[in-house]
Swiss-Prot record:
Coiled-coil ranges from the UniProt annotation: none
Family: Belongs to the actin-binding proteins ADF family.
Residue ranges of every copy of the ADF-H domain listed in the record: 5-137
Gene Ontology CC terms: actin cytoskeleton; cytoplasm; nuclear matrix
InterPro entries assigned to the protein according to its UniProt record, in alphabetical order: ADF-H, ADF-H/Gelsolin-like_dom_sf, ADF/Cofilin
Protein name as catalogued: Cofilin
Protein's cellular compartments: Cytoplasm; Cytoplasm, Cytoskeleton; Nucleus matrix
Any Gene Ontology biological process: cell division
Organism: Zygosaccharomyces rouxii
Record Pfam families: Cofilin_ADF
Known function: Controls reversibly actin polymerization and depolymerization in a pH-sensitive manner. It has the ability to bind G- and F-actin in a 1:1 ratio of cofilin to actin. Binding to F-actin is regulated by tropomyosin. It is the major component of intranuclear and cytoplasmic actin rods. Required for accumulation of actin at the cell division site via depolymerizing actin at the cell ends. In association with myosin II has a role in the assembly of the contractile ring via severing actin filaments. Involved in the maintenance of the contractile ring once formed.
Lineage, highest ranks first: Eukaryota, Fungi, Dikarya, Ascomycota, Saccharomycotina
Keywords: Actin-binding, Cell cycle, Cell division, Cytoplasm, Cytoskeleton, Nucleus
Gene Ontology molecular function: actin binding
């Protein structure tokens, strides 16, 4: 339970585990239920396109997302995969929505074990592939 009184739905944890353990999804989008009591799955996707993921982020509303971020490592070491947690809170979102999402984030974040990086986005430049790649590769200790 978060400071806002919002809890995490079982389906939200199941979708995360399906992404993390089963590689069933590439990303999961989470939102807060209409009655503002539960963090629920809004959408899951198997699309490999990061641009498609970015296209799902609403211009005027908040959400949370988990993304299985793959990237190449230099020196022919191959690909790495890191699970990234996004808090999307655009400047144009309603203040009340931003407050509820900010105060509910910890409940979801604590429930999702195995996340490598946290990204807070208020505009698309903060969640661009290059920006996330830089953050993820730093947390992995490879440059």
């Amino acid at each position: 339970m978060s400071r806002s009184g919002v809890s995490v739905a079982d389906e939200s944890l199941q979708a995360f585990n399906d992404l993390k353990l089963g590689k069933k999804y590439k990303f999961v989008l989470y939102g807060i239920s209409e009655d503002k009591t539960t963090i629920v799955v809004k959408e899951t996707s198997t699309s490999q396109s990061y641009d498609e993921f970015l296209g799902k982020l609403p211009e005027n509303d908040c959400l949370y997302a988990i993304y299985d971020f793959e990237y190449e490592i230099g020196g022919n070491e191959g690909k790495r995969s890191k699970i990234v947690f996004f808090t999307w809170s655009p400047d144009t979102a309603p203040v009340r929505s931003k407050m509820v999402y900010a105060s509910s984030k910890d409940a979801l974040r604590r429930a999702l074990t195995g996340v490598s990086s946290d990204i807070q986005g208020t505009d698309f430049s903060e969640v661009s592939f290059e920006t996330v790649l830089e953050r993820v590769s730093k947390s992995a200790g490879s440059h």
